[in-house]
UniProtKB/Swiss-Prot annotation:
This is Homeobox-leucine zipper protein ATHB-16. Residues 1-31, 219-241 are annotated as: Disordered. It comes from Arabidopsis thaliana (Mouse-ear cress). Residues 1-20, 219-238 have a biased composition (Polar residues). Residues 116-151 are annotated as: Leucine-zipper. It is found in: Nucleus. Residues 56-115 bind DNA. GO terms for cellular component: nucleus.
Length: 294
């Protein structure tokens, strides 16, 4: 029975471990990095198996502390080695060039893993902060939408009230306009009235003038003498007393009350002689034309 070497056993373990890790969803770069790390470990064990005798090939050869520190310093300066530098560094540390190459490969793999973990932590923190800000902004947006809906409802209510007030004011203005359209002055009333007795109203207004008295007499003599006396007294009293003003309201009331009277009363009575005194000849028995010319 052929005994399996340590390199064959490690190759089998590494292949199964990579097969188990592949379904986890690592990226292609990370997967290739892990494969390089496994290859470096295989190379180290092969080297140890070839240079150790009597069962010591199964043990992994470890580097000294000073060798590890020297390799770390060189790695910080440059993580990849050229063939000439690799040979020189191996001679300085007392190692094989293959050992130095394997150590640098493993160190690069660990460094990449740490960088990925660091980047993941930074991205995770940024994601958490953005999620927190998003939640706060969404809450603020909801509160603002509620306030906007309340303000809209309030504005709509105020507009309805203003419309109602405008309607009521328009109705009041129409009522006031209707009342104003009624003729209030005497001239407007006379213009719009039909069948009005203007002569009777004129004679009645003459009676309202100051110091104008109508003397009732049975003959034309008394009418003429009273007219002369009234003219003299009115001229004297007109200088002493101011004329009485007749307002439109009293005139309108007077005209309305006089419209219902009978128009035939205009020619009846003895008062008509004062109005038609200019048309009638004087009937004085003591007056004669011969006396006037003598």
């Amino acid at each position: 029975m052929k005994r399996l070497s340590s390199s064959d056993s490690m190759c089998g373990l590494i292949s199964t471990s990579t097969d188990e890790q592949s379904p986890r969803g690592y990226g292609s770069n990370y997967q290739s990095m892990l494969e390089g790390y496994d290859e470096d470990a295989t190379l180290i064990e092969e080297y140890s198996g070839n240079h150790h005798h009597m069962g010591l090939s199964e043990k992994k050869r470890r580097l000294k502390v000073d060798q590890v520190k020297a390799l770390e310093k060189n790695f910080e300066l440059e993580n990849k080695l050229e063939p000439e530098r690799k040979t020189k560094l191996a001679q300085e540390l007392g190692l094989q060039p293959r050992q130095v190459a394997v150590w640098f490969q493993n160190r690069r793999a660990r460094w990449k893993t740490k960088q990925l973990e660091k980047d993941y932590g930074v991205l995770k923190g940024q994601y958490d902060s953005l999620r927190h800000n998003f939640d706060s902004l969404r809450r603020d947006n909801d509160s603002l939408l509620q306030e906007i809906s309340k303000i809209k409802a309030k504005v709509n209510g105020e507009e309805d009230n203003n419309n109602n007030k405008a309607i009521t004011e328009g109705v009041k203005e129409e009522e006031v306009h209707k009342t104003d359209s009624i003729p209030s002055s005497p001239l407007q009333f006379l213009e719009h009235s039909s069948g009005f007795n203007y002569r009777r109203s004129f004679t009645d207004l003459r009676d309202l003038l100051p110091n104008s008295t109508v003397v009732e007499a049975g003959s034309s003599d008394s009418c003429d003498s009273s007219a002369v006396l009234n003219d003299e007294t009115s001229s004297d009293n007109g200088r002493l007393t101011p004329p009485v003003t007749v307002t439109g309201g009293s005139f309108l009331q007077f005209v309305k009350t006089e419209q219902t009277e009978d128009h035939e009363d205009f020619l009846s009575g003895e008062e008509a002689c004062g109005f038609f005194s200019d048309e009638q000849p004087p009937s004085l028995h003591w007056y004669s034309a011969s006396d006037h010319w003598t």
